[in-house]
Amino acid sequence: MKSIYFVAGLFVMLVQGSWQRSLQDTEEKSRSFSAPQTEPLNDLDQMNEDKRHSQGTFTSDYSKYLDSRRAQDFVQWLMNTKRNKNNIAKRHDEFERHAEGTFTSDVSSYLEGQAAKEFIAWLVKGRGRRDFPEEVAIVEEFRRRHADGSFSDEMNTVLDTLATRDFINWLLQTKITDRK
């Protein structure tokens, strides 16, 4: 993508340069025609025209210099911004985010570890088939229908819960050798 922009920029510069050159050639040709001998040349007018031309050339060159200088300053500013962003500001932000995330991560890890320990302890005790107390609530949710269309969402939730319960019961009731 950058190469396309680069080629387009070069093309624009070439076209602009050719237009400026053709305009300069046209101006030089109009100046190179000598005035007829019958018309007297006024030296004061000739000097004013030369003066305006030299001032215009200086102004044009100076504006080109200022444009290139602005471009250099902009590139330098971009480079400095990128350096500062990568070194100081970004490191500070990452450090803060890391500290906040570490606490959250530690709490989450602790809670996950506790849940895993409780589940393993429950499996080791071998309670056998577990009756879920929420079975009654699940049956009631089956029968209930809402006018706002949440029936299908609740139906999916109920079916997921039933499938999970059946899977856990299957895990508890089958032997390890049967699962292979």
Swiss-Prot record:
GO molecular function list: glucagon receptor binding; hormone activity
Segments forming a coiled coil: none
Coarse class of the protein's main subcellular location: secreted
Induction: Glucagon release is stimulated by hypoglycemia and inhibited by hyperglycemia, insulin, and somatostatin. GLP-1 and GLP-2 are induced in response to nutrient ingestion.
Post-translational note: Proglucagon is post-translationally processed in a tissue-specific manner in pancreatic A cells and intestinal L cells. In pancreatic A cells, the major bioactive hormone is glucagon cleaved by PCSK2/PC2. In the intestinal L cells PCSK1/PC1 liberates GLP-1, GLP-2, glicentin and oxyntomodulin. GLP-1 is further N-terminally truncated by post-translational processing in the intestinal L cells resulting in GLP-1(7-37) GLP-1-(7-36)amide. The C-terminal amidation is neither important for the metabolism of GLP-1 nor for its effects on the endocrine pancreas.
Family: Belongs to the glucagon family.
Name of the protein: Pro-glucagon
